[in-house]
Amino acid sequence: MKFKAIVIDIDGTITCENRELHLGAVKKIRILKVPVVLATGNILCYARTASKLIGLDGAVIAENGGAVTVRYDLNGTFEESLEECEKAFSFLSEYFKLTKLDPFYRKTEIALRRDFNLEKARTLLETQPFDVEMVDTKYAVHIKSTRINKGSGLRKLAEIMGLEAEDFVAIGDSENDIEMFEAAGFGIAVANGDERIKEAANYVTEASYGDGAVEAIEFLESNGWI
C-alpha cells in the first residue's frame, strides 16, 4: 500500500492548543516527499497564508470544500453560492442572536460564533426546505450546502492534480473531516479529535494536536506508505 499525497486539516491538527502553528508539525511537513494539501473550514486567504508559511505549493481546500485551488497564482474554484445559506441564516436569526465570522471573505458558506444552542438550531432547520446543514468545527459553526464538504473538495482537487481521492491519506480532528476520511484512501485522527472522527478513522494517534500530526506522519513513514 503506497499513497501519493496527504491532505491535512489545520486548526487542531497541525496547530498547538492555542491555534498557533505547531513548529514540529511544520518541520515534518516541509521535508515530506509527497504533495501536502491543507484542508480547512476557514477562508481561502487563511488557507493560502498557512500554506505559504509552511512552505507548500499552495494546494488548499477551504470553506469546508467550497473553495479549492492548486497554486498561489490561480484563482480559487468556488463550488456553491451563499443564497441558500443566507435564507437559513435569516430563518435562524428569528430564534437566536447570531454573529457572522469573516462575512466579507466567505464565498460559499456562513460561519457563526459558537455562542448559541446548536442542537436546537439544527432541529429548527430540519423543519425548513433549505438544502443546507450546520457543522461544528470546534472553532465556528458553519452553515453550508449539503452537497459540499471536505470530501467533495478533495475529489475536485485530486482531479485537478491528476490523482484520485483514494491516493491521499487524510489527517484531521473534527466532524467536518469525516467526509474527507471517507473519500481518502486512509484516515488518521489525532488524539484530541472528537469521537465521530475517531470512529471514522483507520488509525488514531496517541498524541494530540501538532504532536499527533507528527506521530501520524511517522506512522505512515514507518509502514512505507508514503
Curated annotation (Swiss-Prot):
Keyword Metal-binding assigned: yes
InterPro entries (alphabetical): HAD-like_sf (IPR036412), HAD-SF_hydro_IIB (IPR006379), HAD_sf (IPR023214), PGPase (IPR006382)
Keywords linked to the UniProt accession: Carbohydrate metabolism, Hydrolase, Magnesium, Metal-binding
Annotated residues for binding of substrate: K150
Keyword flag Metal-binding: yes
Described purpose of this protein according to its UniProt entry: Catalyzes the dephosphorylation of 2-phosphoglycolate.
Name of the protein in its database record: Phosphoglycolate phosphatase
Record organism: Methanosarcina acetivorans (strain ATCC 35395 / DSM 2834 / JCM 12185 / C2A)
